[in-house]
Amino acid sequence: MRKITQEACRAFENAQNYKKSNTKVVRINEVSAEMYLHGNLIAYSDESGIFISNGGWSSNTTKERLNGLTGVNIRQVNYRWYLNGDFWNGGWIRISD
């Protein structure tokens, strides 16, 4: 995992602001944050959990950033993404605890 991914995911999971290169985490409040990649929202958290999306881009960088989050395991087989073993079209989904 790249250092930028580790730093961004740590900031996201601790609801702290972070900005480096193409990745930004915005603290909303003490329990909520949003993660952006190239200006596209790819993850947000609130009191009900963590939600992810590919932001419309099935790129290796998007996959890498999301895979840095706790509870996320995205794999690609024949250009199709699988989230925690199940096919995923990249739309918004809540990550189970």
Please provide the spans of the model-predicted regions.
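Terminal leader/tail segments of proteins
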Residues: 1-97
